[in-house]
Amino acid sequence: MSEKIYEYKDENNWFIGKMTGHNLISGWGVKHTTIKKIDDLLDGIAATLDWENPKGYDVSVVRYQSPLSLITFIIDMINQETQREIKVTPHAGTILLIENAKLLAVYLPEGGVSTATFFATSEQGFGDIILIATRNEGKTKEFRNLFGQLGYRVENLNDYPELPEVAETGTTFEENARLKAETISRLTGKMVLADDSGLKVDALGGLPGVWSARFSGPDATDAKNNTKLLHELAMVFDQKKRSAQFHTTLVVAAPNKDSLVMEAEWPGYIATQPKGENGFGYDPVFIVGETGRHAAELEADQKNQLSHRGQAVRKLMEVFPAWQAKQS
């Protein structure tokens, strides 16, 4: 085993670990009962070998909210140090540990989950499939990268050509996301995730906002939208006055459940000219924070770590298992 120190940190979780211990989770950021429950789940998966040559995990918890984050952190350590391929898959409010198509362990939330939910034969199982309410392949690719890391198979509306287009008649991001998610869920009986995302430019009073995709008119394209945006800011020379934020609102809808809503923003500035070949939408003209790099210059994994959509998905996954397990 290496002496590598692993770390994971977000707004609600902070873990530090190494694989030279005896399968121990400690710290002031988590209850003892939670430690024991996760320790019992993982203890048999990571071999400690012996006291002279330990191979187990040793994790300190500084801040804790999500069992999914902690379990994923420890499994990632085990995989990297032992070349195993254990997958952490949320499913029906539980967390499954799967290796080589075999189920190793199941983490249950407090109160358990109903057998009807867990063994449902419909395709509502979030750990198996998620239907994204969009036909935009660029957006779907981002979601596929994000959810693929968590063991989900992603479909979009192109897989269901018979479904109608849902008019985005709302005046806020949440209204539009709810319209899409709840309408498609009602029509299909499936669990559906919709997002409404856009670019808010401070110098333009928050425009293009909910009209980001149609900013240049009814026949809008990414190139036309970027050209119009740069034209609107042509007389704004100070970069600090070209501040902007990418915003996303995610809504997950399912039959007989209150919808789950999550929001996130990605701050930056609007450049004076496009740059980069990756991404889509306004990525070529969006400067990421104070980095000087355009979003379209980032590789997919880099963008997913930083972007509004990546942040929103990670926030969503913190609360999703409890939401799914809760009976309406």
Swiss-Prot record:
Cofactor(s) listed in the protein's UniProt record: Mg(2+)
Catalysed reactions, as listed in the record: XTP + H2O = XMP + diphosphate + H(+); dITP + H2O = dIMP + diphosphate + H(+); ITP + H2O = IMP + diphosphate + H(+)
Keyword annotations of the record: Hydrolase, Magnesium, Metal-binding, Nucleotide metabolism, Nucleotide-binding
GO molecular function: dITP diphosphatase activity; ITP diphosphatase activity; metal ion binding; nucleotide binding; ribonucleoside triphosphate phosphatase activity; XTP diphosphatase activity
Ranges for region Unknown: 1-129
UniProt GO BP: nucleotide metabolic process; purine nucleoside triphosphate catabolic process
Gene3D superfamilies membership: 3.90.950.10
Coiled coil spans: none
Cofactor binding mode and count: Binds 1 Mg(2+) ion per subunit.
Catalytic activity, EC: 3.6.1.66
Keyword Magnesium: yes
Record-level GO cellular component terms: cytosol
Positions bound to substrate: 134-139, 197, 280-283, 303, 308-309
Catalytic site: 196 (proton acceptor)
Region of interest (NTP pyrophosphatase), residue spans: 130-324
Residues noted as binding Mg(2+) in the record, renumbered to the chain: 196
Pfam families xrefs: Ham1p_like
Family per record: Belongs to the HAM1 NTPase family.
Subunit and interaction comment: Homodimer.
Function: Pyrophosphatase that catalyzes the hydrolysis of nucleoside triphosphates to their monophosphate derivatives, with a high preference for the non-canonical purine nucleotides XTP (xanthosine triphosphate), dITP (deoxyinosine triphosphate) and ITP. Seems to function as a house-cleaning enzyme that removes non-canonical purine nucleotides from the nucleotide pool, thus preventing their incorporation into DNA/RNA and avoiding chromosomal lesions.
This protein's name: dITP/XTP pyrophosphatase
Organism: Streptococcus pyogenes serotype M3 (strain ATCC BAA-595 / MGAS315)
